[in-house]
């Protein structure tokens, strides 16, 4: 059927080619001829969500409102047909929608509805674990905030039991104000079999791509330097690193999001990187005032400090996969412009083969490998690949 072929083409554009705008136009064409096509309604909403979080021109309330309206129409259509599986799918997409805009309580209600309707997906355990983590963080913050604003009653002078007729003068209450922290510079990264993507989270962003200088040494193909002038202060932002493996100096792409830079590098080979950097040369934003000669040592982060900021490789525990280790802290989530950009890039909306490849490779390798290539993974058991200098133990 022509419509089925068009749906496959649009789905491929959205998830395989990573072109949500192209997919949006394709779904629009399908809906012109079939306004109640459930699949087109659901995934047109997904296109709008990806455009909202990935492109500044689409980052508006209207975009997300349109996505929600499409899901509303899809739900009405599915309920009208009595299609239980499609109703479950729409509820799952509602969950993703509200999760991404950080309404975790509402997201949880739709997640439960989807499960109760029998919706099945390989990523459900991962989403459930992620949702639980977010809710726990939110509840903890609310509890801490409540405790912080609790005022203890002051005991009156009459009730102190002090019989002295004279009292020492009462000193003015000194209120110590906690120093405000300077904006943090954080790093996140993930990889596929062909590329490595680095996210630099900072509030000091350039005005355009043209202002960013990205240099990869053609000699060792591992020395990376990223710099640009900060518009507001006139100071310079710099990130320098010695990558753990070689990349193509000529194949570099850059995207600027509301609170981060995203740099994608092409691998020379398909080696799975165990870490981003071999050693740390300089990892600092160098946001000192003009004319101020600060000690160069203050602009260097030690390997120990930087390692705390970077993300750990997923745990190999067979009982539970702690996917929260793949994420930076809550503040970085806020800066990313999405509820969970890193998790979203890896799992949200992946095609069925990619999902199967990721689940199979991670579980069979005991958490030491993560592949998106189903054609490769399906050929046999994925072997355990421990980090360099370590060996697997069989208990």
Swiss-Prot record:
One of its GO terms (biological process) is protein-containing complex assembly. Signal peptide: none annotated. Residues 312-395 form the SGS domain. GO terms for molecular function: protein-folding chaperone binding; protein-macromolecule adaptor activity. There is a cross-link at residue 32 (Glycyl lysine isopeptide (Lys-Gly) (interchain with G-Cter in ubiquitin)). The modification Phosphoserine is found at residues 168, 171. Residues 182-277 form the CS domain. Keywords: Cell cycle, Isopeptide bond, Phosphoprotein, Ubl conjugation, Ubl conjugation pathway. InterPro entries: CS_dom, HSP20-like_chaperone, SGS_dom, Sgt1-like, TPR-like_helical_dom_sf. CDD domains: p23_CS_SGT1_like. Residues 137-175, 373-395 are annotated as: Disordered. One of its GO terms (cellular component) is ubiquitin ligase complex. Involved in ubiquitination and subsequent proteasomal degradation of target proteins. Required for both entry into S phase and kinetochore function. Also involved in cyclic AMP (cAMP) pathway, possibly by participating in the assembly or the conformational activation of specific multiprotein complexes. Belongs to the SGT1 family. Interacts with SKP1/CBF3D. Part of SCF E3 ubiquitin ligase complexes containing SKP1, CDC53, HRT1 and some F-box proteins. Interacts with CIR1/CDC35. Present with 1340 molecules/cell in log phase SD medium. This is Protein SGT1. It comes from Saccharomyces cerevisiae (strain ATCC 204508 / S288c).
């Amino acid at each position: 059927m022509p419509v089925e072929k068009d749906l496959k083409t649009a789905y491929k554009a959205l998830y395989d080619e990573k072109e949500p705008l192209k997919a949006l136009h394709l779904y629009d064409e399908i809906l012109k001829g079939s306004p109640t096509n459930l699949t087109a309604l659901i995934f047109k909403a997904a296109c709008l969500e990806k455009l909202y979080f990935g492109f500044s021109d689409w980052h508006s309330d209207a975009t997300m409102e349109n996505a929600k309206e499409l899901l509303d129409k899809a739900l009405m259509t599915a309920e009208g047909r009595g299609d239980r599986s499609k109703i479950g799918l729409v509820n799952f997409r509602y969950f993703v929608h509200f999760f991404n805009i950080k309404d975790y309580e509402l997201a949880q209600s739709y997640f439960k509805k989807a499960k109760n309707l029998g919706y099945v997906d390989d990523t459900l355990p991962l989403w459930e674990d992620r949702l639980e983590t977010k809710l726990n963080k939110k509840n903890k913050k609310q509890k801490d905030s409540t405790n912080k604003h609790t005022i203890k009653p002051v005991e009156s002078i009459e009730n102190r039991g002090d019989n002295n007729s004279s009292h020492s003068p009462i000193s003015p209450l000194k209120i110590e104000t906690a120093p405000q922290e300077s904006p943090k510079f954080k790093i996140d990264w993930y990889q596929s079999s062909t590329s490595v993507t680095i996210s630099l989270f900072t509030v000091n962003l350039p005005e355009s791509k043209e202002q960013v200088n990205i240099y990869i040494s053609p000699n060792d193909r591992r020395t990376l330097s990223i710099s640009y002038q900060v518009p507001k202060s006139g100071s310079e932002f710099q990130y320098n690193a010695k990558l753990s493996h070689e990349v193509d100096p000529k194949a570099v792409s850059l995207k600027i999001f509301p609170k981060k830079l995203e740099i994608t590098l092409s691998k020379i080979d398909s080696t799975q990187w165990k870490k981003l950097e071999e050693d740390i040369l300089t990892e600092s934003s160098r946001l000192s005032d003009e004319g101020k000669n600060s000690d160069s040592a203050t602009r260097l982060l030690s390997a120990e400090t930087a390692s705390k900021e970077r993300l750990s490789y997923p745990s190999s525990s067979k009982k539970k996969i702690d996917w929260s280790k793949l994420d930076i802290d809550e503040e970085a989530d806020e800066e990313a412009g999405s509820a969970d950009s890193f998790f979203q890039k890896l799992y949200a909306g992946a095609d069925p083969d990619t999902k199967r490849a990721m689940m199979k490779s991670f579980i069979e390798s005991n958490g030491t490998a993560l592949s998106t290539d189903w054609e490769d993974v399906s050929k046999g058991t994925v072997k355990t690949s421990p980090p360099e200098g370590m060996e697997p133990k069989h208990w």
